[in-house]
Amino acid sequence: QYTFETHVKHHGFDPNDAIVEVTPREGEHCIRNEDILNAIQENSDSTALVLFSGINYYTGQLFDMASITKAAQSAGAKVGFDLAHAAGNVELQLHDWGADFACWCTYKYMNSGPGAIGGVFIHEKNHNNELPRFAGWWGYDKATRFKMEKGFIPMPGAEGWQLSTPALFLYAAHRAALEIFEEAHF
């Protein structure tokens, strides 16, 4: 929530006006999917981004990311998911659902340990190298990276948003965890 609030403030908006939160109905613990879809529809004229978690970490509720994606995009909004509690826990089909982007950590259900690397997904329909971004050497086109020429030429996709590389030991822990997932056919 702090990231959203400060991002909205950075762009000169009041978080109380710009952020729409969907909460459970009185006396309930889970958010009904119909309430999420209704909130998207009711705010479609002023919504640029729908950002939701894949799983509510308090209740374990798995959200219907496919229908949320469809509703958000029908309203003309981009849609992204925080998959901190979904990655490594449930099957994800981000590309097939058409989600615009997602991010996740690997230290929880992917068992990579504290401080482990994270992940990001950007749907290929959003691979626009002209988008403004903070640029780093690891996001630069691999074919010409070592020429060190002026002007940033990003790699397509999520790779083009990389700034630098994590420590190698983080990769090692993550690889070991992924090998276990592979053995389990997950």
Regions found by a protein language model. Give the residues of each.
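Substrate-binding/gating loop at the entrance of the active-site cleft, primarily
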Residues: 1-14, 56
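Residues at alpha-helix caps and immediate loop-helix transition turns in enzyme cores, especially N-
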Residues: 3, 32, 61-64, 90, ...
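Proline-centered turn/helix-capping motifs that create local helix->coil transitions or kinks
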Residues: 9-16, 61, 128-131
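Active-site phosphate-binding strand-loop segment of PLP-dependent enzymes
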Residues: 15-20, 24-84, 88, 109
